[in-house]
């Protein structure tokens, strides 16, 4: 027999014999005792196994307790103290793994076995094989180590996972996948911020950075997305491009989703341009995000293009995507395209909801088709196509305001109140404005009084509309009462003076102008011009 090289081992058990050994080398023994000779002659080759009991990895990296890893992860990651700096604790003797005598010594073959055991989640068998290879000086390849590392993490054995990682690091057997797995482990134990700190420390060392690949960058970007760290996401994306890495479908989908979710739609569009240049397609979820980004950036043509590409690929855009696209096209005044998308929405089997109808009403309103807005609203209401909300009522009332349909506006207001919906100040303002346009000053005042009775607080726009309405109705006392009730507001005085000059009530205009100056309010240029132009005429 040749020499079998071992590290320091306190006890060796061969069959039923216990041999105390303190040296590093166990050489061939010449058995002098007869029972020893008989044992040697009768030993079967299949049972040639060194029953060396030892603690897993206790030769160079003792077992550790991971419950104190948090304090270490708070410090900077320097590669040397990820594992060694942790507080180590000896485990009980009952938790010892067995080192097997391996007949096979081919590292590639053993690596394949380790990969197979790891994929089957045979944790104990994989651990014994890994220990045995390491004990005999054999090194699994990086693929096998990563597979084993992933197996340990899947089964929650974080302690051994960090030990294996330290072994790989010392043997310079790490890859980008290795770092990716460990970033995920750190994120689970300590949080995403700690994992990102570890990533930044890795970036600072060129030797480690040479192992970076797209998978690792994807992991770091994903961690940023978990905590909505848009600035770090953008930085990692720029660094990845600077290193010459081309993103994958996952990379661009992550970037688009994060940027849209964090309100950086302009960056999402930049990502999309880069993706198109690299001839990479987005995933379905990222396409939804891009349609949303295009809506915010008023890129309706790009949103429509993405929507059409989804249909060509056999995808079924959801109702939210259809509504978003309709809204985008409606804001651009593309009414024809709006109703084409609506037809597609129906063909996909979606049932239009209140957002769909509001987008359609808004599209008609943007196209100045106010009569069509009211006609569609009446159809929605009469056929109970959806539950009417404040937005639908307001869209109808603003169309009434544009057309001067004060009666219909008042009717919709009372209907809205009767339905139990909360009527906002803006809704009352629309009705008062409709009365103003129709020269129904007294009706406007009644709506204002009704508004006050319902404890709805008026705003500056309410008073502006009331002042203009009362001036056109020659209700000068009411104008004066309104100005007395509210806090001094330069816009109200300017509007009142403009109206009075237009109605040729220069006396009242001059009184308001003097009062305005006494209160320290600064008139605008139009007010000054009107007063200078008509002051002499009024004095005569």
From Swiss-Prot:
Pfam families documented for this protein: PPR, PPR_2
UniProt repeat feature PPR, residue ranges: 106-140, 141-175, 177-205, 213-247, 248-282, 283-317, 318-352, 353-387, 389-423, 424-458, 459-487, 489-523
Keywords tagged on the record: Repeat
Coiled-coil region list: none
Family indicated by similarity: Belongs to the PPR family. P subfamily.
Name under which the protein is recorded: Pentatricopeptide repeat-containing protein At3g29290
Species: Arabidopsis thaliana
């Amino acid at each position: 027999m040749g020499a079998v090289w071992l590290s320091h081992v306190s006890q060796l058990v061969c069959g039923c014999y216990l041999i105390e050994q303190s040296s590093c080398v166990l050489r061939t023994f010449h058995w002098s005792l007869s029972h020893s000779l008989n044992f040697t002659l009768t030993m079967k080759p299949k049972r040639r196994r060194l029953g060396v009991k030892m603690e897993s990895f206790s030769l160079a990296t003792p077992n550790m307790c991971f419950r104190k890893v948090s304090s270490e992860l708070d410090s900077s990651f320097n590669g040397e103290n990820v594992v060694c700096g942790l507080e180590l604790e000896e485990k009980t003797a009952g938790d010892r793994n067995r080192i097997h005598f391996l007949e096979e010594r081919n590292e590639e073959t053993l690596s394949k076995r380790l990969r197979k055991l790891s994929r089957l989640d045979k944790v104990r068998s994989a651990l014994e094989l890994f220990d045995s290879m390491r004990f005999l000086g054999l090194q699994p390849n990086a693929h096998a180590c990563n597979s084993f590392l992933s197996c340990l993490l899947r089964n929650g054995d974080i302690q051994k996972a960090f030990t294996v990682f330290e072994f790989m690091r010392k043997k310079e057997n790490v890859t980008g996948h290795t770092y990716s797995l460990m970033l995920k482990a750190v994120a689970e134990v300590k949080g995403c911020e700690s994992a990102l700190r570890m990533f930044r420390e890795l970036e600072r060392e060129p030797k480690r950075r040479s192992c970076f690949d797209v998978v690792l960058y994807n992991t770091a970007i994903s961690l940023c997305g978990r905590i909505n760290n848009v600035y770090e996401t953008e930085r990692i994306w720029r660094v990845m491009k600077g290193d010459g890495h081309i993103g994958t479908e996952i990379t661009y989908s992550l970037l688009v989703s994060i940027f849209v979710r964090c309100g950086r739609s302009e960056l999402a569009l930049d990502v999309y341009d880069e993706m198109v240049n690299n001839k990479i397609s987005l995933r379905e979820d990222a396409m939804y995000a891009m349609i949303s980004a295009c809506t915010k950036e008023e890129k309706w043509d790009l949103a429509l293009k993405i929507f059409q590409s989804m249909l060509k690929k056999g995808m079924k855009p959801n109702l939210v995507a259809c509504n978003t696209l309709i809204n985008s096209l409606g804001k651009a005044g593309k009414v024809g395209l709006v109703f084409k998308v609506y037809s597609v929405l129906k063909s996909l089997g979606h049932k239009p909801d209140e957002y769909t109808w509001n987008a359609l009403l808004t599209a008609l309103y943007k196209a100045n088709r106010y009569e069509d807005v009211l006609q569609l609203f009446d159809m929605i209401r009469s056929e109970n196509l959806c539950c009417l909300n404040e937005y639908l009522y307001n869209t109808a009332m603003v169309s009434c305001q544009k057309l001067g349909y004060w009666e219909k506006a008042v009717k919709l207001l009372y209907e809205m109140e009767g339905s139990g919906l909360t009527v906002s100040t803006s809704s009352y303002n629309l009705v008062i404005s409709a009365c103003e346009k129709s020269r129904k000053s007294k009706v406007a005042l009644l709506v204002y009084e009704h508004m006050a009775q319902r404890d709805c607080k008026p705003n500056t726009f309410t008073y502006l509309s009331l002042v203009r309405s009362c001036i056109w109705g020659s209700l000068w006392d009411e104008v004066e009462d309104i100005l007395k009730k509210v806090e001094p507001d330069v816009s109200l005085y300017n509007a009142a003076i403009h109206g009075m000059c237009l109605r040729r009530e220069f006396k009242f205009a001059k009184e308001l102008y003097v009062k305005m100056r006494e209160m320290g309010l600064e008139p605008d240029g139009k007010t000054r011009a009107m007063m200078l132009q008509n002051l002499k005429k009024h004095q005569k």
